[in-house]
Amino acid sequence: MKSNPAIQAAIDLTAGAAGGTACVLTGQPFDTMKVKMQTFPDLYRGLTDCCLKTYSQVGFRGFYKGTSPALIANIAENSVLFMCYGFCQQVVRKVVGLDQQAKLSDLQNAAAGSFASAFAALVLCPTELVKCRLQTMYEMETSGKIAASQNTVWSVVKEIFRKDGPLGFYHGLSSTLLREVPGYFFFFGGYELSRSFFASGRSKDELGPVPLMLSGGFGGICLWLAVYPVDCIKSRIQVLSMTGKQTGLVRTFLSIVKNEGITALYSGLKPTMIRAFPANGALFLAYEYSRKLMMNQLEAW
């Protein structure tokens, strides 16, 4: 049975949601450490110091601050990302004059992923804003930048809406787009290139779970090495906007370089690299297997 575009989009969306869930459940503690170290590099000497201080100050739950919005963010982002990825693959086929069922090259898949990420950024930005603020709430309060308040998802959402209205949820959108669009070119490019390496002449669809996870991890490494400084700037903009200071991408970049040096743009890189392999490996494993399961069910039906 040949699926219509609506059914195919629904399958890609559902598989993307499964991948996003797996990604968060696998890598959330490392993401929390990353955001803390990006936003307050002077407070932590490194990953181990950040972990120990977080545990002593807030307990084990401190590693999972922002998990609810992170789940929402990743499910929303990856649902839209993979749904649009399938659509953008068709657009690339039309642009280069290929048949609708033709296999794309690794470079063409990378371009499709880059285009798709622009749509995903629109749903990711609001939820990631809430996540980043929750993850750094303790540091913001103890440093005196904001008054002590209730640290829940709902309280953060209400505060953003009260201060800035609906558009307040898009603090850091330009830096999010600047991270996502080039970043996902390397993400999907690295993933597809790695899958081609493991397939070595066979179909990529025949790859087992270990090559899939390694390919996903390699894609994640490629993404973060390419755009990590932009992610650091984005975290600063989204967290420090709590104080009412609205600084843009360029001003934030210049301020970090002038006051802290260029190395500050790489604060938190270690937990990000550690997280990249298991989290992105789990993402693609869940995506590929759930998508294959649904496609098989559709063909049988």
From Swiss-Prot:
Tell me where it resides.
Answer: Mitochondrion inner membrane; Mitochondrion membrane
Spans traversing the lipid bilayer: 5-25, 68-88, 110-130, 168-188, 207-227, 237-257
Positions of Solcar repeats: 7-91, 104-197, 207-293
Q: In which tissues is it expressed?
A: Widely expressed, with highest levels in the liver, testis and kidney. In the brain, expressed at high levels in the hypothalamus.
Please name the SUPFAM superfamilies in this protein's record.
Mitochondrial carrier
Instruction: Note the topology in the membrane.
Output: Multi-pass membrane protein
GO CC entries: mitochondrial inner membrane; mitochondrion
Q: Which reaction does it catalyse?
A: L-citrulline(in) + L-ornithine(out) + H(+)(in) = L-citrulline(out) + L-ornithine(in) + H(+)(out); L-ornithine(in) + L-arginine(out) = L-ornithine(out) + L-arginine(in); L-ornithine(out) + L-lysine(in) = L-ornithine(in) + L-lysine(out); L-lysine(out) + H(+)(in) = L-lysine(in) + H(+)(out)
List this protein's GO terms for biological process: L-arginine transmembrane transport; L-lysine transmembrane transport
From which organism does this entry originate? Mus musculus (Mouse)
Q: What does this protein do?
A: Mitochondrial ornithine-citrulline antiporter. Catalyzes the exchange between cytosolic ornithine and mitochondrial citrulline plus an H(+), the proton compensates the positive charge of ornithine thus leading to an electroneutral transport. Plays a crucial role in the urea cycle, by connecting the cytosolic and the intramitochondrial reactions of the urea cycle. Lysine and arginine are also transported by the antiport mechanism. In addition, catalyzes an electroneutral exchange of ornithine or lysine for H(+), a reaction driven by the pH gradient across the inner membrane.
User: Record keywords: Transport included?
Assistant: yes
What is the activity-regulation note? Inhibited by pyridoxal 5'-phosphate as well as by mercurials (mersalyl, p-chloromercuribenzene sulfonate, and mercuric chloride), N-ethylmaleimide and spermine.
Alphabetical UniProt keywords: Antiport, Membrane, Mitochondrion, Mitochondrion inner membrane, Repeat, Transmembrane, Transmembrane helix, Transport
Family (UniProt): Belongs to the mitochondrial carrier (TC 2.A.29) family.
Q: Quote the PANTHER family the UniProt record gives.
A: MITOCHONDRIAL BASIC AMINO ACIDS TRANSPORTER-RELATED, MITOCHONDRIAL ORNITHINE TRANSPORTER 1
Primary location recorded for the protein, binned into one broad class: mitochondrion
Protein name according to UniProt: Mitochondrial ornithine transporter 1
* Single Gene Ontology MF annotation: antiporter activity
